[in-house]
Regions:
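Short catalytic-loop micro-motif centered on adjacent basic/acidic residues
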Residues: 38, 229, 311-313, 367-368
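Short beta-alpha connecting loops at secondary-structure transitions
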Residues: 343, 398-404, 421-426, 461-468, ...
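Leucine-rich repeat domain C-terminal region
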Residues: 442-443, 459-461
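Right-handed parallel beta-helix
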Residues: 201-214, 234-248, 260-284, 290-310, ...
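Extracellular polysaccharide-degrading/modifying enzymes targeting complex plant/algal/animal polysaccharides
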Residues: 2-232, 237-244, 250-252, 256-289, ...
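A conserved amphipathic helix/loop scaffold
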Residues: 451
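Predominantly extracellular/luminal carbohydrate-interaction, adhesion, and secreted-enzyme modules
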Residues: 226-228, 310, 343-344
Length: 661
């Protein structure tokens, strides 16, 4: 059945074509498996709470009849501003409009939040641009540049709120503009399109603009909301949407509300947040965390931008998903929020998740795979400018920047055929990573560090059931057929510590030399007395806690990038100066480089799953989610690799000059 919605209809109807509903949520209350909800262009200021899910063979589809013409927003327009002082105006909002959730009394705060409790989930927007929350009315009046912002010219637009009786009083510094003549909105709803109950699966959301919700901080051991999300269900498709201006997360593929483990550390203090993450994994299994019930979502062809925690986030609920062909950019650029959950994509337990053909730039981090990146594949993506600008001061509690961060996982985590162009390409406080056919212009950081005594789960291959827990031994990493270029300065990068005082230095020298202290497989295996069938447990105790081996072959190094001292069959060019830059043709990114002039006749071998072997702890191959083998015979663009195997993401040197996205 087709159900029709039109915000511009003369009056409420019954959902027929002749008499459409005016609100999407009316359709969401009656839709049954197989139904299609057709939504006409218009502004829908409502929260859509689907009552029913579809089935695998009979999805419920919500479709904007005009691409991005139907806008679902968590905001309301405000036109009762009055002059206050200088460039500052004031308005009063009756708190009844907020119902049980007032964003202007709710702080962005919780587990793993490091930037101090001062920002609200509410926000003021002028002409679709989120304004900056001032710490005081005086700061709002002054309207000074915020020194941590990545967009300083926008940071002078300030707002401030306070409570008086049953009213929220909002002050806004509009820098000489009359807010009653501009499009000024405030967010009032926590979500835009998300079931209030779990298990509402097999829904497609296609072609909508979704924006301006008062979402909350969403760490891994808490309820994780977003402007849109499946809320612990299976089989959603979110496609061809524009997702923007969330206070915290844009799309949540995350965790349900567990009242016994919701910001436990923040509220009770007596157990570490790391312990409660482990508990969340185990409790999740009790609450239905199975391949048959949760995950297997698709997020594709979406434009996700200007969200201040993450573009896509989620703990556990995103397993077995495909995230492809998305443009994710300008995430956390305001630098008002800081903590360990911020990235273009931040997911815990990305089991068998595939991230492919995404374009990710100008984010605090590109993709952050935290815990249980088992069977995860990051392939054919373009990353650049995921680094703090030189003019921006680091936010205390803000995170270090890099294209990819893999943290405290056991693998197999596969990173192949990507262009990694920021100053830090991979932060690897983890083990069990394979990097194959990438262009790597930034450093490998945090090698052998950043894990502490944390012990994390690994799983039955291609399942969610826990197989064991182990600390991170580091190593078990593979580097095949990559190109490393020292594009950025090699001097160490000074960073503020996340939640403690002081600074640290982070590596900015490009190359696999950071693995110099790690053994080859042959060196490692000799520690285990393989020539006896009566091993001595006490004797081997030290070996069982030692670094795992590393493999490297077929890599090329330019501009001073350094090779692992035990690597053979590589190219180290110390003579030529190589340039790698992103340029734009007709608004599309193109790689400008001369590196292929200096490869000469150097080539590598075809890489297969059998080449990479198994990740050590889960004993799972680097393979497809269905268990089939991977042959790396297709490049970044999908072109075929023939008899000559060039290092890097392109099968032929001419492909590097093609449009990348």
């Amino acid at each position: 059945m087709k159900i029709y919605v039109d915000a511009k209809a003369a009056r409420d109807g019954n959902g027929s074509k002749e008499s459409p509903f005016k609100c999407i949520n009316d359709a969401a209350q009656i839709a049954q498996p197989g139904d299609e909800i057709l939504v006409e262009p218009g502004i829908y200021r409502e929260y859509v709470d689907p009552r029913n899910g579809g089935r695998e063979d009979a999805r419920i589809t919500y479709r904007s009849t005009q691409m991005l013409g139907a806008v679902i927003t968590g905001a309301e327009e405000v036109k009762n501003w009055k002059p206050y002082q200088g460039n500052v105006w004031v308005c009063r909002i009756d708190n009844s409009i907020f119902g049980s959730y007032n964003p202007y009394t709710t702080y962005v705060y919780g587990d793993w939040y490091f930037a101090g409790r001062s920002k609200h989930t509410g926000a003021v927007y002028m002409n679709d641009k989120m304004m900056y929350e001032a710490e005081s009315l005086d700061a709002c009046i002054k309207g000074e540049v915020y020194e941590c912002s990545w967009e300083p010219e926008a940071s002078v637009y300030k707002w401030y709120s306070q409570q008086e009786g049953n009213e929220t009083v909002l002050y806004g510094n509009f820098q000489g503009k009359n807010p009653n003549e501009e499009k000024v909105e405030i967010n009032v709803r926590r979500e835009c399109f998300m079931p209030s109950k779990t298990g509402v699966g097999y829904i497609t959301v296609s072609g909508f603009s979704i924006n301006k919700a008062a979402t909350t901080w969403a760490p891994p051991a808490a309820y994780q909301d977003g402007m849109i999300g499946p809320h612990w269900s299976k089989g959603w498709i979110i496609e061809d949407c524009e997702i923007s201006n969330s206070k915290c997360a844009g799309i949540s593929l995350g965790k349900y509300l567990d009242p016994e483990n919701d910001h436990y550390f923040t509220y009770k203090h007596v157990k570490s947040p790391t312990q409660m993450e482990r508990d969340a994994v185990c409790r999740g299994q009790y609450h239905g965390w199975l391949k048959e019930k949760v995950g297997s979502h698709i997020v594709r062809r979406c434009n996700i931008h200007n969200c201040e925690q993450g573009g896509i986030i989620g703990r556990m609920g995103g397993v077995f998903s495909v995230i492809e062909d998305n443009h994710i950019h300008h995430i956390n650029n305001m630098m008002e929020l800081g903590g360990a959950e911020i990235a273009g994509i931040k997911m815990h337990a990305a089991i068998d998740v595939i991230y492919r053909r995404n374009y990710i730039h100008h984010c605090t981090m590109g993709i952050w795979c935290d815990w249980e990146a088992q069977g995860t594949r990051i392939t054919q993506n373009l990353f650049h400018d995921n680094q703090r600008p030189e003019f921006a001061k680091q936010l205390k509690g803000g995170m270090m920047s890099q294209d990819i961060f893999v943290e405290v996982g056991h693998g197999p985590t596969l990173i192949d055929n990507n262009n990694l162009l920021s100053d830090a390409s991979l932060r690897m406080a983890t083990e069990g990573v394979a990097m194959v056919h990438n262009l790597i212009c930034g450093a490998l950081t945090c090698v052998g560090e950043g894990t502490g005594p944390r012990y994390t789960p690994y799983h039955i291959p291609h399942r969610t059931e826990v197989m064991g827990f182990m600390t991170i031994l580091h190593g078990d990493d593979r580097f095949y057929n990559n190109i490393f270029v020292q594009k950025w300065p090699a001097t160490p990068f000074v960073t503020l510590r996340d939640s403690r005082e002081g600074t640290d230095e982070e590596n900015r020298e490009v190359g696999t030399h950071v693995m110099d202290e790690y053994p080859t497989y042959e060196e490692w295996i000799t520690m285990f007395d393989m020539d006896t069938d009566t091993p001595d447990m006490a004797k081997l105790e030290t070996a069982h806690g030692s670094h795992l081996p590393v493999w490297a072959k077929g890599n090329a190094y330019f501009n001073g990038a350094k090779a692992w001292k035990k690597e053979t069959d590589n190219l180290v060019d110390t003579e030529h100066e190589v340039q790698v830059e992103i340029t734009f043709q007709d608004g599309k990114p193109v790689l400008a480089t001369n590196l292929y002039e200096f490869l000469g006749d150097f080539s590598g071998s075809m890489i297969h799953s059998d080449t990479l072997g198994c990740a050590f702890e889960p004993e799972e191959r680097f393979e497809n989610p269905d268990g089939s083998s991977i042959t790396f015979d297709r490049d970044y663009l999908g072109e075929h690799r023939g008899m000559r195997i060039l290092p890097g993401p392109f099968a032929d040197k001419t492909d590097a000059g093609k449009k990348l996205w």
